[in-house]
Amino acid sequence: MRKDEIMHIVSCADDNYARHLGGMFVSLLTNMDQEREVKLYVIDGGIKPDNKKRLEETTLKFGVPIEFLEVDTNMYEHAVESSHITKAAYYRISIPDLIKDESIKRMIYIDCDALVLEDISKLWDLDIAPYTVAAVEDAGQHERLKEMNVTDTGKYFNSGIMIIDFESWRKQNITEKVINFINEHPDEDFLVLHDQDALNAILYDQWYELHPRWNAQTYIMLKLKTPSTLLGRKQYNETRENPAIVHFCGGEKPWNSNTKHPYRDEYFHYMSYTKWNTIGNPAINQ
């Protein structure tokens, strides 16, 4: 990729997670190559006006505005929800359809419960052709592809951080295929991992595998899972020593007082530079 190329980064949040998205954006903007240009997008999962204002004020301190994207929520009326996963989690599926500017060829999607600790241009500049997405294998070592009768082989990716190639995605009508899969399986006992299950069911053989440093999941950071291969164990050690993106997936959120996550202090560090640093944020004030 050219160094003068604009990097397009998108995330999604509801009102409860808007503050954590602010922290993620601060970490990204702080640690990126300052000679590169970035555009930020937020899929609006119901963020209230005051929190939108705080988000915008947070990133404008770095000279970077936010473009908010609206999803047709009717597309996801049959999507399975749970106590900790709302329909907003599915909205990433619509990303290539929400972007009308044909000059934008790809985007990086990053979950809002993450910290970007390395220059994001290193990820942006990766050539992932001929694949549709690039992602990290899910550290839970799930047998979801087999359990969903998709395939007996292949790896299952975590959808929290993805490079999305728009041309490949649109050419294959991936959004339509994923939504059809969701509508065909409106059962929480089937779509156990929600949007991630549906994305994997369609893209299981079309994704480029990234080093786990680019999605340092809680399973890895807390040594809750051990890969079966020597290479896998080596990569997990490298990830713990030097994570590029820390993803606070699962229940070990840094804003919970009882968390054992080793990057909890870094979370509070980046949150201190947001507009939630002292206002109405129990995570900061506890």
From Swiss-Prot:
Induction: By different stresses such as heat shock and salt stress and by starvation. InterPro entries: Glyco_trans_8, Glycosyltrans_8_dom-fam, Nucleotide-diphossugar_trans. Mn(2+) binds at residues 111, 113, 247. One of its GO terms (molecular function) is nucleotide binding. Keywords: Glycosyltransferase, Manganese, Metal-binding, Nucleotide-binding, Stress response, Transferase. It comes from the Bacteria. UDP binds at residues 12-17, 111-112, 247-253. Belongs to the glycosyltransferase 8 family. This is General stress protein A. It comes from Bacillus subtilis (strain 168).
